[in-house]
């Protein structure tokens, strides 16, 4: 069901069976004394799992609501400071940051996380610089099986720990009724946030022996993938400079060229029509202009897909005009119109998200915006 193809071939007996209800102890930390105590205990540990809870997924805009820690499987702590209208008291953000900063910055080669690049980006904005990351369970899973389709915490917990984690919807609601995490009651938030850190630590303890048994993969994650997390994190935060004035000028030029192509298409067809309508294209191509039918759709209708247009463009002018119209419209809607709207008001730059654990080949991908898909220059 989870489509973990290679993993399914493993001996089922090797999968750790844990009851649906984990043996766990999750605590809310809302006093300086308690915070000092867990920091002291965590500092003595060889591995510290961390997780941040925020108001959103945009690492340049989301507000930090709380931080969870786990240094022993089954034991985790949630330190909230940004929840709204709570009867249970919280520590002030300034106090939490002042104590976590020296603790986390000194914990070199100890800190692990699940997609820890996001946590690193968030914490950097709050003045905490995490370097020398020990590991990332998402990347451990990816290195073990790059062909698996999911490396998120819920999927890994289900597969490796036989445990179904709480989902964001469980605590924040669904659809239009869903709230941001700062509005989630602290009782629910504590179990959810602490569980994330606890499960991350449990996964690390499960995946580490598997990687240790395969030396090339262990070397890959230690020497390339984990160091790359910090490089990509820095790249994301630095952002990419865009000249919105040039983009606006290009958008205006594209709009003019698109309108000229539309007029040209109308003239060739002998009537105005919707260039994006498959039905109208079919009528004009095959009923009015009698173009030859190259192939048909599963429904038996003459096809007007991209390959058909390219072949018809070798014989007729209208398909050639339509292909150029589509190319320019794509450039305008995807790039010259959209990119300026993705420029951060805080930095004046575009901040993409790079993904290490997506492609089976190991290459990077990016999103919001996809800066690896900018088209090459055309004539």
Name each model-derived stretch.
Residues 114, 163-166:
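Short helix-interrupting loop/turn segments at helix-coil junctions
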Residues 139-143:
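Long, compositionally biased intrinsically disordered terminal regions
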Residues 126-130:
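Helix-loop-beta element that forms the nucleotide-linked donor phosphate-binding surface
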Residues 49, 108-116:
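Acidic beta-strand-to-loop metal/phosphate-binding motif
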Residues 90-108:
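Short, basic/hydrophobic alpha-helical segments
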